[in-house]
Amino acid sequence: MIYKVFYQASNDEVPVREKTDSIFVEAQSEREVRSKLKPYNYNIEFIQQVEGAFLEYEKQSENFKVLEL
């Protein structure tokens, strides 16, 4: 499954909506996504499973890249 993760790059700062980034991660569960990203010290805001029409739409973006962690 592919998950879209909304995050702040630094866990040490107060979250600011304008600094939110997103990445795509392949994993079997939300828990696995969190464990894969733990070493990066991201401030994870939201994790969303991406499938079906939503996945096809995201694939059209030039920024679509699934991280292999």
Swiss-Prot record:
Its EC number is 2.7.7.6. Belongs to the RNA polymerase subunit epsilon family. Keywords: DNA-directed RNA polymerase, Nucleotidyltransferase, Transcription, Transferase. GO terms for cellular component: DNA-directed RNA polymerase complex. One of its GO terms (biological process) is DNA-templated transcription. One of its GO terms (molecular function) is DNA-directed RNA polymerase activity. This is DNA-directed RNA polymerase subunit epsilon. It is an enzyme of class 2 (transferase). A non-essential component of RNA polymerase (RNAP). The keyword DNA damage does not apply. It catalyses: RNA(n) + a ribonucleoside 5'-triphosphate = RNA(n+1) + diphosphate. RNAP is composed of a core of 2 alpha, a beta and a beta' subunit. The core is associated with a delta subunit, and at least one of epsilon or omega. When a sigma factor is associated with the core the holoenzyme is formed, which can initiate transcription.
